């Protein structure tokens, strides 16, 4: 699994570096690259490749999808780390973008990464049917704005030190994390003509995203900052509404196992073609950073 992740990281980073190299250079490109590279494990990109394998989608198309997703993800991390949000100093084992370059520069770098995602998907060299292209841009827009990441982050901040129901926490985590995972699982399907698979993989993606968020919360609960590459135990200090704070550590693990079983049951009909996707899901649960 580690070799497959490294391969994904290298391929996506190469695409993004080449894409940026062809653009007119600006002073803002330095903090943009700082927030984007080397990046994390590229789990979202790996899911795109995994689902692409199920439906036999060419890698050259998957690279556009994954690069756009990583731009969105990096933008969200830069903004999440800001003092007015989660106020973090360390991300991916190094200073957060605002600590390195200042708050205003970090905001602008994050904004630029958000728009870069749309630039990549609308690029004429991403040579797909225009209706499919519009569907992808529409979907990633929903995943990033008030119906997705931004809306989820708003709720995350708003729920601090409050009693919140399990369903509200789940809805918040699906917005904050699950929607972009849903795009990762759904976008390769959109490139095919298998419309009957769209709803199914949208739900699978949301569930994987929820699984990822639970795993992330478990890392915050039990790991060290050195291992995780970011501050840990910050959720409890800030009174964050998480499934761990609501259900307890053991019950959160049980809920994650239930989710995994549901996802695996949904993949039964795809045989060996879904083996990479299942392996990635197992990795999401077992990771320590």
Positions of the model-derived regions?
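C-terminal end-of-chain micro-motif
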Residues: 1, 288-289
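N-terminal amphipathic/basic leader segments beginning at the initiator methionine
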Residues: 1-20
